[in-house]
C-alpha cells in the first residue's frame, strides 16, 4: 500500500502496537525510516530493528518495542511537521520536549538526528516528530 506520509505511518504503527502491548511491529522498509529508527534506538526508545528481505524483492523493517515494568517506554509520540504544514526550526529555536525529558527528531542537512545532537552540530532543520 502506498502512503503519502511514511513518517506518520511509522509513528502510527509504533503507537498502535504499543497500545496492544505487542513485542514487535513491522513496517515497509526505506532509508528514511531506518534513519528514524536508528535515532529512536540510540535514544533508548526501542530495543532495536532489523531489515527483512522478502522473496518478492520488497524489504520490511521489523521493530522490537521496549517496555519497562509492563508499560511502554514511549509515552507520547506526536508528528509535528506534516506534508500540509512543514515546521522548521533554527538551532536557536529547537523545541525542548517536556523540559528536556523527551526528544525532538529532526531532518537536517547532516541527516536525521535528535534535537540535542542538532544543537551540538549547530544545525537546524525540519522538526519531524517529538517523543516522550
Curated annotation (Swiss-Prot):
Q: Which Gene3D superfamilies match?
A: 3.30.1370.30, 3.30.1490.10
Q: Which terms under GO biological process does the entry name?
A: translation
Q: Which GO molecular function annotations are given, in alphabetical order?
A: rRNA binding; structural constituent of ribosome
Question: What is an example of a Pfam family matching this protein?
Answer: Ribosomal_S8
Q: What function does this protein fulfil?
A: One of the primary rRNA binding proteins, it binds directly to 16S rRNA central domain where it helps coordinate assembly of the platform of the 30S subunit.
Q: Which NCBIfam families match?
A: PRK00136.1 (NF001109)
Q: How does it assemble?
A: Part of the 30S ribosomal subunit. Contacts proteins S5 and S12.
Record protein name field: Small ribosomal subunit protein uS8
From which lineage does this chain's organism come? Bacteria, Pseudomonadati, Pseudomonadota, Alphaproteobacteria, Hyphomicrobiales
Gene from which this protein is expressed: rpsH
Amino acid at each position: 500500500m502506498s502512503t503519502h506520509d511514511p513518517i506518520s505511518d511509522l509513528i502510527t504503527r509504533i503507537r498502535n502496537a504499543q497500545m496492544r502491548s505487542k513485542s514487535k511491529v513491522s513496517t515497509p522498509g526505506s532509508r528514511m525510516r531506518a534513519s528514524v529508527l536508528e535515532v529512536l534506538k540510540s535514544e533508548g526508545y526501542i530495543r532495536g530493528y532489523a531489515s527483512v528481505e522478502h522473496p518478492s524483492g520488497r524489504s520490511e523493517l521489523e521493530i522490537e518495542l521496549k517496555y519497562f515494568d509492563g508499560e511502554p517506554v514511549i509515552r507520547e509520540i506526536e508528528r509535528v511537521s506534516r506534508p500540509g504544514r512543514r515546521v522548521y526550526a533554527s538551532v536557536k529555536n529547537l523545541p525542548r520536549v517536556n523540559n528536556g525529558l523527551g526528544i525532538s527528531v529532526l531532518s537536517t542537512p547532516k541527516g536525521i538526528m535528535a534535537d540535542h545532537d542538532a544543537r551540538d552540530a549547530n544545525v537546524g532543520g525540519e522538526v519531524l516528530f517529538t517523543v516522550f
